[in-house]
Amino acid sequence: TQDGKYWLHAGSTNRMATKEELSRLFQQAGLVHFDTSPVASTNISDIDLKAVDHYYRSYYEIDFINLPEDEQRNLLINTDILIEHESNWRVSVGGLLMFGKQPQRYLPQSSIMFAVFKGDDITDDLIDKKEISGTATELIDKAVSLSQLYIPKPSTIEGNQRKEVIHIPPKVLREAVVNAVMHRDYSIGIRKIQLHIYSNRIEITSPGTLANKLTMEKIRYGNSAPRNIFLVKYLDNLRYFDGLGRGIPMMLKALGERIRFEHVGELFRLTLYFSQQD
């Protein structure tokens, strides 16, 4: 409206949009990126400077840790790890997720809830449950390693040799976890990624629907419109994915009909079904 207010149409009524709703609407349209937003109460002491040094040495061949403090600060500012907010320098959401000492202290929604069930339903007996915490790369590495422990590994006999059946190729599992961490909506503060392993499948449920007018059909053909541009850049530089839009097509090629994408309310769910054994 002319007075700067935004209204949402719900059924036969209109109501003023909340700050959180506006944030998600602007994110979905690609107008703002939450991962470059400042996190209140943070400062440079919340950044693991050794991790930053490792990144800059590996990717840019910059000896970050031995730079003068003012040069370190300028580099953090120029790369959106530090963001100015109300005359103070705060760590960005992406900066915390990539280089924070304790990301979940300020972003509790950024952990992954991991659970393993005995059967194929969430009401079945619980075998294991863990909350996975850490930086984005730690979340990915821990979630993949933990999942591999619980994915069934049946074997068949061919001739005189035992052959292990690979239900979910490692590259597919890793791609699925990377996508969840990289593309979830971190502005939804009460939701965490859910990674559930059942007797017949893996379900990864991420907060937020597809962003920037992406559709289920478009992602099948490698179309991408990232919600979190900071995370995409840094995870790409660290070789957690190749940035060519090949991930989903690769998963479809590997699993065929054993993969499913769906929206569940404001959530995005990826299901990877295990192969059926005779």
Across the structure, where does each feature detected by a protein language model lie?
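Conserved N-terminal catalytic/coupling substructures associated with nucleotide/phosphate chemistry
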Residues: T1-D278
